[in-house]
Amino acid sequence: MMLNKKGLVAALALGGSMLLVAGCAGGGDTGGGDAGGGDTIKIGVLATSEGNLAFGMDEAKAAIAVALGARDGDVDGATIAGKTVEIIYAGTDGTTASAQTQAKKLVESDGVDIVFGPVSGDEGETIVQYALTVPEVTFVNGSASPVGMTLEGAENFFRFHGDSAMWMGGVGDYAVNDKGYKKVYLLAEDYSFPYDNAGGFFQEFCAAGGEINGASWVPVGTTDYATIIAQIPADTDAVYAGLGGADAASFLSQAVTNGVTKPLIGGTIAVDTTALSGDANIASAAVGMISGGPVPGAGFSNPVWDDFVAAYATQPNAFPSPSIFALLYYNSFESLLLSLEAAEGDLSDDQAALRDELSNLSWDSPTGKITMDANRQAIVDNYMNEVVQADDGSLVLETITTTNGVKQGTTVYDRFETCGDIE
């Protein structure tokens, strides 16, 4: 199922109205710790500290520490444009209720000027709806990637990375025309991010002549994949695994123990270091898995990327290489800091100067140039990758092709079972 823009507007408006009622009932001060005239700018950071993506807070802090460390600051703050920037962290469990509660606390109790985050897709949609109710606060996304967040989002909300459908661009054509996959079984988590991520792949795959020959949408946190593996049709050419974090690692492990011999196509976060670095025994399932996303392969190098990787490696609890979450949080937080500096820390007039800089930002990030479109959505470079085994036995990405200047489309996806559902 796909949603048109009219339906999306109605959904966001309804969600925003419901949150507005909840906000009014809760009382308390709304944001604006600086309100343009003080010497302190408060930034509230949302990141997952529990659940399937519990590592999100560590990755967020690593990214922020790298960005602020380059300005003689640390994970808790720095001096930016003559203002004291104070960071307040709020952990979530990846659910909408948790994200809403923590965002409201940051704005209405802690009095932050800017909300930065969250990590996951459903959280992101909730935060956009909340942003509609507090227009005096600026929101900069962390890594949440549903398509609709910026297509019809709040004017005070900015995203400095691609959406999850953009990330799979080119992979569907490659699967059919280069890999020869004609029938693919769909396995993915049942929430907004995988809908768009899988939709971006399968719309292209189906248009190229491919067929979805079965589908399983599973709850986040699923631990038993044996029954799903058993029902994969024998004539399947490949399995699409739209899973992330602990779920992806669990599936890959069970794919090995249950004798899955079909090639795999990974959703963007299924091939992330957070899934590939935990179990050395998953190589037989993971090697050869193709995917697309914002993280380049192991051979990628430029001075900005190399500096980022080196600084990331010094952070507590760092993965062998920067995860997608660390990269997106870094690119997004650095974008915020560059804009604060360009605005000279001015948050007056409903943060007009800051928002103008955010809307028009252009810079060379570790993974390529970032510019913004009229919807406050980034135009970015994208990487199609394949999982390979390095000489030391570790699983890493190897880039197949790079696409520069990828722009957002206008299709928002829901659950689908067949190619006919997304045509």
Annotated model-derived regions:
Residues 341-356:
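Short, charged, surface-exposed loops that flank catalytic or proteolytic processing sites
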Residues 56-75, 98, 167-170, 192-211, ...:
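Short, solvent-exposed amphipathic alpha-helices that sit
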